[in-house]
C-alpha cells in the first residue's frame, strides 16, 4: 500500500503526490487517511484518472471535497473501486461505492467486484429474438422489445420518460418473476424515493437492487454509479439468470463525463461534450449484453436536450440500442399518453421473421395510415377536410382513431388520472389495430378510442356516447 499527500485541490479534482516508484494505476481507488481532519468527509474515496508524471496523479473525488487541503495524507488501496454483489444487495438502496443508504444495517455479501470490467467476448454473446411483452399497445405494436435486448426511451423535459419507465417496471418486473437492478444516475431524489415506495407496496422490493447517484452529488459519483449498478446486474447474469437493468438517465451519465472531462482539462469537442464521448458510452453499453449463461434486458431513459435528437449525446446512444422509443412533445400536447411517436420509434424486432406476418402487416398498415395523415395535415389546415378525396377522408378518419387508440391509462398514473391502468396483451393489441385499419370501426366516433385498453372497451364506450 502506498501513501501519498494532497498537493492541489480544485473542486472535485485532487492532485496527489506519491513516491515515484509507487504511483497508483489508472482507476485505482485511494482513500483519505482516517486521522486527517475533522472537516473532510470520513473515508472519502478518490479515483485515479491521470498520471501526470513525477509521482503525481490526478484524481476525481467520489464524494464531497469540502474540507480537503494540501498536505493531507491519502492511502492507496491497490485495487479499483469494488462493490458488494449477489443476493445481499436485493431490497437495498446503495450509493456509488456500494454502501447502504437506506439505514437498514450493513449489506450481507461475501463477494465484491470491481466496477471496471471488460465486456464479454464476441464468442460468448447470445443474440435473442424472443419478444418481451410490455402490455403497452404502442410499444408492443410498433417497437417491440427483445428479451435480452437494449431499449432507449428518448424524450425532452416533461414528456413522460420516467412515467413510461415506471410503467414498464410495473408491467415487466412484476410479471417477470426474475431480478431487477435499478440505477438512478443524476436524477431527482424524489423519483428514487417514489420508486422505492412503489416497489415496497407491490411486494417486489426483495427482487430489486437499487443504486443511486443523484443530481445533488459530485460528478464523480454520477459518472460511476451506472457502472456500479451494471456490475451488480452482471453478477446475477453470470449466475445464469435473466436480469432487468433499468437506467434513469443515460444523458446524466454523459453530462457527468462532460463535467469530469472539463475538470481534467481536456479540450471539449462538439457542443462542449467530452472528446471521449463515444468511447465512454461504448464502455458502458458494450457491457450491457446477454451471454450464453444469462441475459440482461436493459431499459434506459435518455433525456434529449432541447428536443434535438441530433445532439451528440442521444445520437451516440442510438447506435447501441435494439429498440428506440421516441417520446414526442407534439403528441403529449394533444393529450395522448404515452406520448410515443409511432413514426419515429423503431425496433430491430419488427421483422416478419421475428414477430410474424400478421403483426408486421398491422404495424406497417398503422404507420402508413398515420404517415398519410401527416402528409395531408397542411392541406387540411389551409383548405379544410371538404377538399379531400373520399379515400383521403377515410384515411384521415382512421388515422385519428388509431392516434387515440394508441393512448392508454397507466397503472402508475392512476393517482393523477383517476382511471384504472390497463395491461393489454399483444394478441389483443394486434386484433384492435387490425380492425381499425381494415375499416371495421369506421362507424365508431373517434372519442370512443381515447384512453381505453382493448378494442372491445372502445365499442362499449361508443355505446355510452350515443
Curated annotation (Swiss-Prot):
Catalysed reactions listed for this entry: ATP + H2O + 4 H(+)(in) = ADP + phosphate + 5 H(+)(out)
Membrane topology: Peripheral membrane protein
Main location: membrane
PROSITE patterns in the cross-refs: ATPASE_ALPHA_BETA (PS00152)
EC number: 7.1.2.2
SUPFAM superfamilies (alphabetical): C-terminal domain of alpha and beta subunits of F1 ATP synthase, N-terminal domain of alpha and beta subunits of F1 ATP synthase, P-loop containing nucleoside triphosphate hydrolases
Molecular-function annotations in GO: ATP binding; ATP hydrolysis activity; proton-transporting ATP synthase activity, rotational mechanism
Pfam families reported in the protein's UniProt record: ATP-synt_ab (PF00006), ATP-synt_ab_N (PF02874), ATP-synt_VA_C (PF22919)
Enzyme class, broadest EC rank: translocase
Keywords: ATP synthesis, ATP-binding, Cell inner membrane, Cell membrane, CF(1), Hydrogen ion transport, Ion transport, Membrane, Nucleotide-binding, Translocase, Transport
Ranges in a coiled coil: none
Compartments where located: Cell inner membrane
Residues annotated as binding ATP: 155-162
Entries under PANTHER family matching the protein: ATP SYNTHASE (PTHR15184), ATP SYNTHASE SUBUNIT BETA, MITOCHONDRIAL (PTHR15184:SF71)
The family this protein is said to belong to: Belongs to the ATPase alpha/beta chains family.
HAMAP family assigned to the protein according to its UniProt record, in alphabetical order: ATP_synth_beta_bact (MF_01347)
Assembly behavior: F-type ATPases have 2 components, CF(1) - the catalytic core - and CF(0) - the membrane proton channel. CF(1) has five subunits: alpha(3), beta(3), gamma(1), delta(1), epsilon(1). CF(0) has three main subunits: a(1), b(2) and c(9-12). The alpha and beta chains form an alternating ring which encloses part of the gamma chain. CF(1) is attached to CF(0) by a central stalk formed by the gamma and epsilon chains, while a peripheral stalk is formed by the delta and b chains.
Protein name: ATP synthase subunit beta
Amino acid at each position: 500500500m502506498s501513501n501519498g499527500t494532497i498537493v492541489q485541490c480544485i473542486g472535485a479534482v485532487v492532485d496527489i503526490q506519491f513516491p515515484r516508484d509507487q504511483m497508483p494505476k489508472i482507476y485505482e481507488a485511494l482513500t483519505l487517511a482516517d486521522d486527517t481532519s475533522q472537516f473532510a468527509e470520513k473515508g472519502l474515496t478518490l479515483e485515479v484518472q491521470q498520471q501526470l508524471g513525477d509521482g503525481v496523479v490526478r484524481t476525481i473525488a467520489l464524494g464531497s471535497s469540502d474540507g480537503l487541503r494540501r498536505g493531507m495524507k491519502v492511502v492507496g488501496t491497490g485495487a479499483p473501486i469494488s462493490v458488494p454483489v449477489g443476493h445481499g444487495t436485493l431490497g437495498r438502496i446503495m450509493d456509488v461505492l456500494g454502501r447502504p443508504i437506506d439505514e437498514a444495517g450493513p449489506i450481507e455479501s461475501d463477494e465484491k467486484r470491481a466496477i471496471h470490467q471488460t465486456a464479454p467476448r464476441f464468442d460468448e454473446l447470445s443474440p435473442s429474438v424472443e419478444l418481451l411483452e410490455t402490455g403497452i399497445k404502442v410499444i408492443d405494436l410498433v417497437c417491440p422489445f427483445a428479451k435480452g435486448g437494449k431499449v432507449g426511451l428518448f424524450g425532452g423535459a416533461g414528456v413522460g420518460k420516467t412515467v413510461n419507465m415506471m410503467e414498464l417496471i410495473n408491467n415487466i418486473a412484476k410479471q417477470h418473476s426474475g431480478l431487477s437492478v435499478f440505477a438512478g444516475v443524476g436524477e431527482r431524489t424524489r423519483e428514487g424515493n417514489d420508486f422505492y415506495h412503489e416497489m415496497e407496496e407491490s411486494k417486489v422490493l426483495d427482487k430489486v437492487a437499487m443504486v443511486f447517484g443523484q443530481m445533488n452529488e459530485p460528478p464523480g459519483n454520477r459518472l460511476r454509479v451506472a457502472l456500479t449498478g451494471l456490475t451488480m446486474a452482471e453478477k446475477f447474469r453470470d449466475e445464469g439468470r435473466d436480469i432487468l437493468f433499468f437506467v434513469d438517465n443515460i444523458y446524466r451519465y454523459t453530462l457527468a463525463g462532460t463535467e469530469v472531462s472539463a475538470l481534467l482539462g481536456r479540450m471539449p469537442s462538439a457542443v462542449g461534450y467530452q472528446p471521449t464521448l463515444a468511447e465512454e458510452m461504448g464502455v458502458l453499453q458494450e457491457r450491457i449484453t446477454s451471454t450464453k449463461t444469462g441475459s440482461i434486458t436493459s431499459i434506459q431513459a435518455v433525456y434529449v436536450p432541447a428536443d434535438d435528437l441530433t445532439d451528440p449525446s442521444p445520437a451516440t446512444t442510438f447506435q447501441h440500442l435494439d429498440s428506440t422509443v421516441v417520446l414526442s412533445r407534439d403528441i403529449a400536447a394533444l393529450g395522448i399518453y404515452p406520448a410515443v411517436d409511432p413514426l419515429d420509434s423503431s425496433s430491430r424486432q419488427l421483422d416478419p421473421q421475428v414477430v410474424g406476418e400478421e403483426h408486421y402487416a398491422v404495424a406497417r398498415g398503422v404507420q402508413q395510415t398515420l404517415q398519410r395523415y401527416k402528409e395531408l395535415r397542411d392541406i387540411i389546415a389551409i383548405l379544410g377536410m371538404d377538399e379531400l378525396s373520399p379515400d383521403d377522408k377515410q384515411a384521415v378518419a382512421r388515422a385519428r382513431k388509431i392516434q387515440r387508440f394508441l393512448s392508454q391509462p397507466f397503472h402508475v398514473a392512476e393517482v393523477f388520472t383517476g382511471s384504472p391502468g390497463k395491461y393489454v396483451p399483444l394478441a389483443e393489441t394486434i386484433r384492435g389495430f387490425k380492425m381499425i385499419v381494415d375499416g371495421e370501426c369506421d362507424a365508431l366516433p373517434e372519442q370512443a378510442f381515447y384512453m381505453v385498453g382493448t378494442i372491445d372497451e372502445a365499442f362499449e364506450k361508443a355505446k355510452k356516447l350515443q
